[in-house]
Protein backbone atom coordinates (compact mmCIF):
# COMPACT_ATOMS: atom_id res chain seq x y z
CA UNK A 1 0.00 0.00 0.00
CA UNK A 2 2.81 2.44 0.87
CA UNK A 3 4.44 1.79 -2.51
CA UNK A 4 1.14 2.40 -4.29
CA UNK A 5 0.59 5.68 -2.44
CA UNK A 6 4.16 6.80 -3.17
CA UNK A 7 3.83 5.92 -6.85
CA UNK A 8 0.55 7.79 -7.28
CA UNK A 9 1.86 10.79 -5.32
CA UNK A 10 4.92 10.90 -7.60
CA UNK A 11 2.74 10.79 -10.72
CA UNK A 12 0.53 13.59 -9.41
CA UNK A 13 3.58 15.68 -8.51
CA UNK A 14 4.94 15.26 -12.02
CA UNK A 15 1.56 16.34 -13.34
CA UNK A 16 1.77 19.46 -11.20
CA UNK A 17 5.22 20.29 -12.51
CA UNK A 18 4.07 19.86 -16.10
CA UNK A 19 0.84 21.87 -15.89
CA UNK A 20 0.31 23.36 -19.31
CA UNK A 21 -2.10 25.55 -21.18
CA UNK A 22 -2.06 25.72 -24.96
CA UNK A 23 -4.62 26.38 -27.63
CA UNK A 24 -5.45 22.66 -27.63
CA UNK A 25 -5.10 21.66 -23.96
CA UNK A 26 -5.79 23.13 -20.53
CA UNK A 27 -4.51 21.15 -17.53
CA UNK A 28 -4.87 22.00 -13.84
CA UNK A 29 -3.59 20.33 -10.70
CA UNK A 30 -4.74 20.80 -7.10
CA UNK A 31 -5.66 19.21 -3.83
CA UNK A 32 -7.02 19.67 -0.34
CA UNK A 33 -6.03 18.81 3.22
CA UNK A 34 -8.57 18.79 6.07
CA UNK A 35 -7.46 17.94 9.60
CA UNK A 36 -10.12 17.55 12.31
CA UNK A 37 -10.03 17.50 16.11
CA UNK A 38 -13.12 16.67 18.19
CA UNK A 39 -14.37 15.97 21.70
CA UNK A 40 -17.79 14.39 22.22
CA UNK A 41 -19.95 12.36 24.55
CA UNK A 42 -23.36 11.87 26.16
CA UNK A 43 -23.58 14.81 28.52
CA UNK A 44 -19.86 15.20 29.16
CA UNK A 45 -17.08 15.07 26.59
CA UNK A 46 -15.96 11.51 27.30
CA UNK A 47 -14.15 10.93 24.01
CA UNK A 48 -11.56 12.81 22.00
CA UNK A 49 -10.05 12.14 18.62
CA UNK A 50 -8.48 13.53 15.49
CA UNK A 51 -8.21 12.53 11.86
CA UNK A 52 -7.26 13.67 8.40
CA UNK A 53 -10.84 13.96 7.17
CA UNK A 54 -9.77 14.45 3.57
CA UNK A 55 -6.42 14.32 1.75
CA UNK A 56 -7.03 14.64 -1.97
CA UNK A 57 -5.15 15.38 -5.15
CA UNK A 58 -6.69 16.03 -8.54
CA UNK A 59 -6.01 16.92 -12.12
CA UNK A 60 -8.64 18.39 -14.42
CA UNK A 61 -8.64 19.92 -17.84
CA UNK A 62 -10.10 20.50 -21.26
CA UNK A 63 -8.90 19.30 -24.64
CA UNK A 64 -9.58 20.81 -28.05
CA UNK A 65 -12.55 22.75 -26.74
CA UNK A 66 -14.91 19.76 -26.63
CA UNK A 67 -13.59 17.22 -24.11
CA UNK A 68 -13.22 17.68 -20.34
CA UNK A 69 -11.85 15.34 -17.70
CA UNK A 70 -11.23 15.09 -13.98
CA UNK A 71 -9.14 12.67 -11.93
CA UNK A 72 -9.40 12.99 -8.15
CA UNK A 73 -8.01 10.52 -5.60
CA UNK A 74 -8.47 10.46 -1.83
CA UNK A 75 -5.73 9.24 0.55
CA UNK A 76 -7.45 9.72 3.92
CA UNK A 77 -7.72 6.79 6.33
CA UNK A 78 -4.54 5.20 5.00
CA UNK A 79 -6.14 3.93 1.80
CA UNK A 80 -6.67 5.12 -1.75
CA UNK A 81 -10.09 5.57 -3.29
CA UNK A 82 -11.53 7.11 -6.43
CA UNK A 83 -13.58 10.26 -6.06
CA UNK A 84 -14.15 11.99 -9.38
CA UNK A 85 -12.81 10.03 -12.34
CA UNK A 86 -14.72 11.06 -15.43
CA UNK A 87 -14.60 12.23 -19.04
CA UNK A 88 -17.11 14.61 -20.62
CA UNK A 89 -18.04 15.41 -24.21
CA UNK A 90 -19.36 18.96 -24.73
CA UNK A 91 -21.27 20.81 -27.46
CA UNK A 92 -23.82 18.05 -28.05
CA UNK A 93 -27.39 18.79 -29.25
CA UNK A 94 -29.56 21.07 -27.07
CA UNK A 95 -26.40 22.59 -25.58
CA UNK A 96 -25.78 19.16 -24.12
CA UNK A 97 -22.88 17.55 -22.30
CA UNK A 98 -22.34 13.81 -21.77
CA UNK A 99 -20.31 12.75 -18.72
CA UNK A 100 -19.12 9.14 -18.27
CA UNK A 101 -17.21 7.65 -15.34
CA UNK A 102 -17.31 7.84 -11.54
CA UNK A 103 -18.89 11.01 -10.16
CA UNK A 104 -21.70 12.39 -7.99
CA UNK A 105 -25.24 11.56 -8.95
CA UNK A 106 -27.28 14.76 -9.57
CA UNK A 107 -29.25 14.81 -6.32
CA UNK A 108 -29.31 17.61 -3.73
CA UNK A 109 -27.51 20.95 -3.63
CA UNK A 110 -25.51 20.28 -0.45
CA UNK A 111 -24.36 16.84 -1.64
CA UNK A 112 -23.15 18.28 -4.96
CA UNK A 113 -21.39 21.19 -3.26
CA UNK A 114 -17.65 20.59 -2.79
CA UNK A 115 -16.52 19.85 0.78
CA UNK A 116 -14.10 22.77 0.33
CA UNK A 117 -17.00 25.20 0.34
CA UNK A 118 -19.74 23.73 2.57
CA UNK A 119 -20.72 25.93 5.52
CA UNK A 120 -20.26 23.32 8.27
CA UNK A 121 -17.63 20.66 8.87
CA UNK A 122 -20.11 17.93 7.95
CA UNK A 123 -23.14 17.97 5.69
CA UNK A 124 -26.60 17.81 7.30
CA UNK A 125 -28.28 14.54 8.31
CA UNK A 126 -30.02 14.00 4.92
CA UNK A 127 -26.61 13.04 3.49
CA UNK A 128 -27.15 9.58 5.01
CA UNK A 129 -30.10 9.13 2.66
CA UNK A 130 -28.37 10.56 -0.41
CA UNK A 131 -26.50 8.59 -3.05
CA UNK A 132 -23.21 10.27 -3.83
CA UNK A 133 -20.58 9.00 -6.26
CA UNK A 134 -21.27 5.98 -8.44
CA UNK A 135 -20.30 4.82 -11.91
CA UNK A 136 -22.51 5.79 -14.80
CA UNK A 137 -23.38 8.23 -17.58
CA UNK A 138 -25.13 11.59 -17.25
CA UNK A 139 -26.49 14.06 -19.78
CA UNK A 140 -26.76 17.65 -18.57
CA UNK A 141 -27.82 20.83 -20.29
CA UNK A 142 -29.21 24.30 -19.70
CA UNK A 143 -31.86 26.51 -21.26
CA UNK A 144 -30.54 30.03 -21.05
CA UNK A 145 -29.01 31.13 -17.77
CA UNK A 146 -31.86 30.05 -15.51
CA UNK A 147 -33.03 26.48 -16.16
CA UNK A 148 -30.64 23.52 -15.75
CA UNK A 149 -31.39 19.82 -16.30
CA UNK A 150 -29.32 16.75 -15.36
CA UNK A 151 -30.23 13.08 -15.80
CA UNK A 152 -28.16 9.92 -15.56
CA UNK A 153 -28.12 6.16 -15.16
CA UNK A 154 -25.79 4.68 -12.55
CA UNK A 155 -24.59 1.40 -11.07
CA UNK A 156 -23.44 1.00 -7.48
CA UNK A 157 -19.63 0.77 -7.47
CA UNK A 158 -16.72 0.18 -5.11
CA UNK A 159 -13.96 2.62 -4.03
CA UNK A 160 -12.30 2.25 -7.43
CA UNK A 161 -15.43 2.83 -9.53
CA UNK A 162 -15.82 -0.86 -10.39
CA UNK A 163 -19.08 -2.81 -10.46
CA UNK A 164 -18.34 -6.51 -10.81
CA UNK A 165 -21.59 -7.79 -9.29
CA UNK A 166 -24.22 -9.48 -11.39
CA UNK A 167 -27.17 -8.17 -9.35
CA UNK A 168 -27.92 -5.36 -11.80
CA UNK A 169 -28.48 -2.63 -9.18
CA UNK A 170 -29.28 0.23 -11.55
CA UNK A 171 -30.42 3.72 -10.57
CA UNK A 172 -31.89 6.56 -12.62
CA UNK A 173 -31.35 9.99 -11.07
CA UNK A 174 -32.61 13.29 -12.49
CA UNK A 175 -32.60 16.88 -11.30
CA UNK A 176 -33.87 20.27 -12.44
CA UNK A 177 -32.87 23.64 -10.97
CA UNK A 178 -34.08 27.15 -11.63
CA UNK A 179 -32.04 30.27 -10.90
CA UNK A 180 -34.89 32.67 -10.21
CA UNK A 181 -32.61 35.53 -9.10
CA UNK A 182 -28.93 36.04 -9.86
CA UNK A 183 -28.14 39.73 -9.83
CA UNK A 184 -25.42 41.50 -7.89
CA UNK A 185 -25.27 40.14 -4.34
CA UNK A 186 -28.73 38.54 -4.54
CA UNK A 187 -29.50 34.96 -5.54
CA UNK A 188 -32.44 32.56 -5.38
CA UNK A 189 -31.86 28.92 -6.35
CA UNK A 190 -34.71 26.37 -6.55
CA UNK A 191 -34.51 22.70 -7.41
CA UNK A 192 -36.19 19.29 -7.40
CA UNK A 193 -34.73 15.83 -7.98
CA UNK A 194 -35.74 12.18 -8.11
CA UNK A 195 -33.80 8.93 -7.90
CA UNK A 196 -35.33 5.51 -8.49
CA UNK A 197 -33.02 2.76 -7.31
CA UNK A 198 -33.52 -0.89 -8.19
CA UNK A 199 -32.51 -3.35 -5.48
CA UNK A 200 -31.93 -6.81 -6.90
CA UNK A 201 -30.13 -7.89 -3.73
CA UNK A 202 -33.43 -7.21 -1.90
CA UNK A 203 -31.88 -5.31 1.02
CA UNK A 204 -31.67 -1.66 2.05
CA UNK A 205 -29.70 -0.26 4.97
CA UNK A 206 -28.19 2.99 6.19
CA UNK A 207 -26.76 4.50 9.37
CA UNK A 208 -25.95 8.01 10.56
CA UNK A 209 -23.79 9.87 13.04
CA UNK A 210 -24.74 13.17 14.68
CA UNK A 211 -22.77 15.27 12.13
CA UNK A 212 -19.53 14.31 13.90
CA UNK A 213 -17.46 12.08 11.64
CA UNK A 214 -15.33 10.84 14.55
CA UNK A 215 -18.39 9.91 16.63
CA UNK A 216 -20.39 6.70 16.78
CA UNK A 217 -23.34 5.80 14.56
CA UNK A 218 -26.50 6.72 16.48
CA UNK A 219 -29.24 5.39 14.21
CA UNK A 220 -29.48 2.65 11.62
CA UNK A 221 -32.06 0.74 9.64
CA UNK A 222 -31.98 -2.55 7.76
CA UNK A 223 -34.84 -3.70 5.56
CA UNK A 224 -35.17 -7.08 3.85
CA UNK A 225 -37.18 -8.06 0.77
CA UNK A 226 -36.81 -4.61 -0.80
CA UNK A 227 -37.82 -4.24 -4.45
CA UNK A 228 -36.72 -0.66 -5.09
CA UNK A 229 -36.07 2.64 -3.33
CA UNK A 230 -37.44 5.96 -4.55
CA UNK A 231 -36.02 9.32 -3.39
CA UNK A 232 -37.66 12.68 -4.02
CA UNK A 233 -35.96 15.90 -2.91
CA UNK A 234 -36.56 19.64 -2.97
CA UNK A 235 -33.97 22.38 -2.44
CA UNK A 236 -33.87 26.15 -2.00
CA UNK A 237 -31.04 28.62 -1.39
CA UNK A 238 -31.26 32.39 -0.97
CA UNK A 239 -28.40 34.89 -0.73
CA UNK A 240 -28.73 38.59 -0.01
CA UNK A 241 -25.37 40.23 0.62
CA UNK A 242 -23.72 38.76 3.74
CA UNK A 243 -26.73 36.63 4.73
CA UNK A 244 -27.67 33.27 3.22
CA UNK A 245 -30.47 30.77 3.82
CA UNK A 246 -30.55 27.18 2.60
CA UNK A 247 -32.91 24.22 3.08
CA UNK A 248 -33.55 20.78 1.60
CA UNK A 249 -36.02 17.97 2.26
CA UNK A 250 -35.99 14.32 1.16
CA UNK A 251 -38.69 11.70 1.10
CA UNK A 252 -37.27 8.18 0.79
CA UNK A 253 -39.78 5.43 -0.01
CA UNK A 254 -38.63 1.85 0.52
CA UNK A 255 -40.79 -0.40 -1.66
CA UNK A 256 -40.91 -3.95 -0.36
CA UNK A 257 -41.66 -7.10 -2.33
CA UNK A 258 -45.41 -7.90 -2.38
CA UNK A 259 -46.52 -9.93 0.60
CA UNK A 260 -47.69 -13.35 -0.63
CA UNK A 261 -50.35 -13.73 2.04
CA UNK A 262 -51.74 -10.18 1.79
CA UNK A 263 -50.90 -9.67 -1.93
CA UNK A 264 -50.07 -5.97 -1.66
CA UNK A 265 -46.91 -3.89 -1.58
CA UNK A 266 -45.66 -2.51 1.74
CA UNK A 267 -43.97 0.90 1.66
CA UNK A 268 -41.81 2.38 4.39
CA UNK A 269 -41.13 6.13 4.29
CA UNK A 270 -38.23 8.08 5.79
CA UNK A 271 -38.29 11.88 5.92
CA UNK A 272 -35.06 13.88 6.28
CA UNK A 273 -34.44 17.60 6.06
CA UNK A 274 -32.31 20.54 7.18
CA UNK A 275 -32.44 24.32 7.28
CA UNK A 276 -29.50 26.64 7.82
CA UNK A 277 -28.59 30.31 8.02
CA UNK A 278 -25.20 32.01 7.79
CA UNK A 279 -23.98 35.58 8.10
CA UNK A 280 -20.60 37.14 7.22
CA UNK A 281 -19.56 39.50 9.99
CA UNK A 282 -17.02 41.06 7.61
CA UNK A 283 -19.48 41.68 4.76
CA UNK A 284 -18.54 38.99 2.21
CA UNK A 285 -21.11 37.23 0.02
CA UNK A 286 -21.39 33.56 -0.93
CA UNK A 287 -20.42 32.98 -4.56
CA UNK A 288 -22.50 30.71 -6.80
CA UNK A 289 -20.62 28.47 -9.24
CA UNK A 290 -23.25 26.47 -11.11
CA UNK A 291 -26.24 24.17 -10.79
CA UNK A 292 -23.97 21.09 -10.65
CA UNK A 293 -21.44 22.60 -8.23
CA UNK A 294 -23.49 24.84 -5.96
CA UNK A 295 -21.58 27.49 -4.05
CA UNK A 296 -17.90 28.26 -4.48
CA UNK A 297 -14.87 29.91 -2.94
CA UNK A 298 -15.10 32.73 -0.39
CA UNK A 299 -12.70 35.59 -1.07
CA UNK A 300 -12.11 37.77 2.02
CA UNK A 301 -12.12 41.51 1.49
CA UNK A 302 -8.82 41.62 3.37
CA UNK A 303 -6.64 38.53 3.77
CA UNK A 304 -5.10 37.68 7.11
CA UNK A 305 -1.66 39.29 7.36
CA UNK A 306 -2.38 41.79 4.58
CA UNK A 307 -3.70 44.66 6.70
CA UNK A 308 -6.64 42.49 7.69
CA UNK A 309 -7.92 39.45 9.58
CA UNK A 310 -9.68 37.63 6.77
CA UNK A 311 -13.41 36.84 6.74
CA UNK A 312 -15.60 35.59 9.60
CA UNK A 313 -18.86 33.70 9.13
CA UNK A 314 -21.43 32.71 11.78
CA UNK A 315 -23.82 29.85 10.96
CA UNK A 316 -26.57 27.71 12.51
CA UNK A 317 -28.43 24.63 11.26
CA UNK A 318 -31.20 22.26 12.30
CA UNK A 319 -31.46 18.86 10.62
CA UNK A 320 -33.41 15.67 11.22
CA UNK A 321 -34.14 12.12 10.07
CA UNK A 322 -37.54 10.64 10.94
CA UNK A 323 -37.72 6.86 10.49
CA UNK A 324 -41.23 6.62 11.95
CA UNK A 325 -41.50 3.53 14.17
CA UNK A 326 -37.75 2.89 13.80
CA UNK A 327 -36.74 6.07 15.65
CA UNK A 328 -35.39 9.51 14.78
CA UNK A 329 -32.35 11.76 15.05
CA UNK A 330 -32.31 15.55 15.37
CA UNK A 331 -29.22 17.78 15.29
CA UNK A 332 -28.58 21.41 16.15
CA UNK A 333 -25.25 22.76 14.84
CA UNK A 334 -23.68 26.18 15.32
CA UNK A 335 -20.43 27.20 13.68
CA UNK A 336 -17.82 29.89 13.25
CA UNK A 337 -15.67 29.94 10.11
CA UNK A 338 -12.49 31.95 9.80
CA UNK A 339 -11.32 32.42 6.20
CA UNK A 340 -7.70 33.54 6.47
CA UNK A 341 -7.49 33.83 2.68
CA UNK A 342 -9.34 32.25 -0.27
CA UNK A 343 -7.49 28.94 0.23
CA UNK A 344 -7.22 28.59 4.01
CA UNK A 345 -10.05 28.13 6.50
CA UNK A 346 -10.36 27.27 10.20
CA UNK A 347 -13.76 25.96 11.31
CA UNK A 348 -15.32 25.60 14.77
CA UNK A 349 -18.54 23.58 15.23
CA UNK A 350 -20.73 22.61 18.17
CA UNK A 351 -23.26 19.83 17.54
CA UNK A 352 -26.05 18.61 19.79
CA UNK A 353 -27.64 15.39 18.58
CA UNK A 354 -30.81 13.91 20.08
CA UNK A 355 -31.67 10.33 19.16
CA UNK A 356 -34.97 8.60 19.96
CA UNK A 357 -35.05 4.83 19.46
CA UNK A 358 -38.05 2.69 18.55
CA UNK A 359 -39.03 2.54 22.26
CA UNK A 360 -38.97 6.31 22.61
CA UNK A 361 -35.81 6.32 24.74
CA UNK A 362 -33.72 9.49 24.29
CA UNK A 363 -29.93 9.68 23.90
CA UNK A 364 -28.17 13.05 23.66
CA UNK A 365 -24.66 13.53 22.27
CA UNK A 366 -22.69 16.78 22.38
CA UNK A 367 -19.63 17.45 20.25
CA UNK A 368 -17.17 20.30 19.82
CA UNK A 369 -15.00 20.16 16.72
CA UNK A 370 -12.33 22.11 14.89
CA UNK A 371 -11.00 21.81 11.34
CA UNK A 372 -7.91 23.28 9.71
CA UNK A 373 -8.36 23.30 5.93
CA UNK A 374 -6.09 24.15 3.03
CA UNK A 375 -6.71 23.70 -0.68
CA UNK A 376 -4.55 24.54 -3.65
Which residue stretches match the model-derived regions?
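Bacterial Sec-dependent N-terminal signal peptides
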Residues: 1-23
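Intrinsically disordered, low-complexity segments enriched in glycine/proline and serine/threonine
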Residues: 5-6, 28, 251
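Active-site-proximal flexible loops/turns
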Residues: 9, 108-109, 255, 356
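Generic structural signal for beta-strand residues in well-ordered domains
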Residues: 10-13, 50, 307, 337
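Residue-level signature of transmembrane alpha-helix interfaces in integral membrane proteins
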Residues: 18-19, 117, 161, 257, ...
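Outer membrane beta-barrel
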Residues: 22-159, 164-200, 236, 274-284, ...
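Outer-membrane beta-barrel pore domains
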Residues: 43-45, 89, 205-376
Amino acid sequence: MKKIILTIATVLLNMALTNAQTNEKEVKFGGRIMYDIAAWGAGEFDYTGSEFRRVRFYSSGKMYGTVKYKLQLDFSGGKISFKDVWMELNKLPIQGNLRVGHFKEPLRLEALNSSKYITFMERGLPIAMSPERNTGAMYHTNFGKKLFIQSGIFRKSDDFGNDKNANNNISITSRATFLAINKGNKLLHLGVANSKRKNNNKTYSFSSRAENHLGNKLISINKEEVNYVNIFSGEVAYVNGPISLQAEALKTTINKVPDIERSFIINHEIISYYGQISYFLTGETKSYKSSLSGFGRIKPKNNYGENGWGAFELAARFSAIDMQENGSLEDVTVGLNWYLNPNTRIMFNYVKGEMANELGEITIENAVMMRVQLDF
